[in-house]
């Protein structure tokens, strides 16, 4: 029966899905590694695992679509009004909701600025929405003129700041020029997943002035809750109301809402600040150590919780680290990132282990060359 079933699936499968490949998330790339791989530094997760309490009293009831405790707490944290906020299953769902709400399949397009986060393109492809590209400049700043040339051709402009994987923040004047240029034709989506590591560059305070911006946020990075899948879209009320038309009826499970509210409490925010400080300190130590290695070139900036670097020994180093139980992310397939690897800042112990293995690798390479 396998062949008839496969033929049926091929017959019924959505045409724009047929040529797609599943997104290679950091977790999927090493699926099945389990406990064999102890040091996960490939997904920009936090090294901290915080404790929370769960009340099961309401587990027999469907949850609120937009849990008030979470909405109110995050609105206060971000400095916006509750009606300017939508909570979703990670910022990734926010990306998909924006595309579904503001792009007509088979007709409209979005603009991305590579090298950047891959889910903008993946979500557009799965929704049968076109993808235009305006690559970043060599210094990873926005190519504003290239972006502006797409006015009237795209409905959404995705800009990641701080940018994954380059760690660079977008100049506010450049971003303002883009926002104003598309004021009557497109929504500019500013992905601030890493904004806790670059707080002074948030656009949240500008929401009231610019109706064509939407901001993506998450609890997955600095808040150390990647496993929770809880993200936010910040925008003026008409944008939020449009997203509410396409979001699922019960997107936020009750346990997720409870934990998110605790993470956003006054005590939770103190923990956040303390842990961000530790990560920033460890990031500086990692950068300093990597900069001393002859075959390593630091790339981009450090406005997030990761470090990007280039080495001609990229493949061999990656293989060595995997064999040593340390997983980092290969970014060399992205434009202008040849031979680049990305390291998530881990715990002090993880970072020491990483640096030890990197040092051992280059020592072995030198010994081999001398022999």
From Swiss-Prot:
Record has Iron-sulfur as a keyword: no
Domain of life, per lineage: Bacteria
Residue numbers bearing the N6-(pyridoxal phosphate)lysine modification: 221
The keyword Transferase belongs to this UniProt entry's keyword annotation: yes
Cross-referenced InterPro entries: Aminotrans_II_pyridoxalP_BS, Aminotransferase_I/II_large, HisP_aminotrans, PyrdxlP-dep_Trfase, PyrdxlP-dep_Trfase_major, PyrdxlP-dep_Trfase_small
EC number(s) given by UniProt: 2.6.1.9
Pathway the protein acts in: Amino-acid biosynthesis; L-histidine biosynthesis; L-histidine from 5-phospho-alpha-D-ribose 1-diphosphate: step 7/9
Reaction(s) the record says it catalyses: L-histidinol phosphate + 2-oxoglutarate = 3-(imidazol-4-yl)-2-oxopropyl phosphate + L-glutamate
Gene3D superfamilies given in the database record: Aspartate Aminotransferase, domain 1, Type I PLP-dependent aspartate aminotransferase-like (Major domain)
Biological-process GO terms, alphabetical: L-histidine biosynthetic process
Cofactor: pyridoxal 5'-phosphate
The entry's keywords: Amino-acid biosynthesis, Aminotransferase, Histidine biosynthesis, Pyridoxal phosphate, Transferase
Molecular function terms, GO-annotated: histidinol-phosphate transaminase activity; pyridoxal phosphate binding
HAMAP family reported in the protein's UniProt record: HisC_aminotrans_2
Subunit structure, as described in the record: Homodimer.
Family to which this protein belongs: Belongs to the class-II pyridoxal-phosphate-dependent aminotransferase family. Histidinol-phosphate aminotransferase subfamily.
Protein name (database record): Histidinol-phosphate aminotransferase
Species of the source: Pseudoalteromonas atlantica (strain T6c / ATCC BAA-1087)
């Amino acid at each position: 029966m396998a062949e008839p079933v496969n033929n049926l699936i091929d017959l019924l499968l959505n045409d724009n899905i047929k040529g797609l490949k599943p997104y290679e998330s950091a977790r999927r790339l090493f699926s099945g590694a389990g406990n064999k791989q102890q040091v996960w530094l490939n997904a920009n997760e936090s090294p901290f695992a915080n404790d929370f309490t769960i009340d099961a009293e309401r587990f027999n009831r469907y949850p609120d679509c937009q849990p008030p405790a979470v909405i109110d707490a995050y609105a206060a944290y971000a400095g916006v009004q509750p009606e300017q906020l939508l909570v979703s299953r990670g910022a990734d769902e926010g990306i998909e909701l924006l595309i579904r709400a503001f792009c007509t399949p088979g007709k409209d397009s979005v603009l991305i600025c590579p090298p950047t986060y891959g889910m903008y393109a993946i979500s557009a492809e799965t929704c049968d929405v076109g993808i235009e590209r305006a690559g970043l400049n060599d210094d990873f700043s926005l190519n504003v003129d290239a972006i502006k040339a797409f006015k009237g051709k795209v409905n959404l402009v995705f800009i990641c700041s701080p940018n994954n994987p380059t760690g660079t923040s977008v100049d506010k004047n450049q971003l303002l020029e883009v926002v104003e240029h598309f004021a009557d034709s497109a929504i500019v989506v500013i992905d601030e997943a890493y904004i806790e590591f670059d707080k002074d560059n948030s656009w949240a305070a500008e929401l009231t002035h610019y109706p064509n911006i939407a901001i993506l946020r998450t609890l997955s990075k600095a808040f150390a809750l990647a496993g929770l899948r809880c993200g936010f879209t910040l925008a003026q009320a008409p944008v939020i109301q449009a997203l509410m038309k396409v979001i699922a009826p019960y997107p936020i499970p009750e346990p997720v809402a409870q934990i998110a509210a605790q993470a956003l409490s006054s005590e939770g925010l103190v923990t956040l600040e303390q842990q961000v400080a530790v990560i920033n300190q460890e990031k500086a130590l990692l950068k300093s150590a990597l900069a001393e290695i002859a075959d390593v070139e630091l790339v981009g900036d450090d406005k997030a919780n990761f470090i990007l670097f280039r080495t001609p020994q990229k493949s061999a180093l990656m293989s060595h680290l995997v064999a040593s139980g340390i997983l980092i992310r290969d970014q060399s397939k992205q434009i202008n990132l040849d031979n680049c690897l990305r390291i998530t800042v881990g715990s002090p112990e993880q970072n020491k282990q990483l640096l030890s293995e990197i040092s051992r690798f280059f020592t072995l390479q030198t010994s081999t060359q001398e022999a």
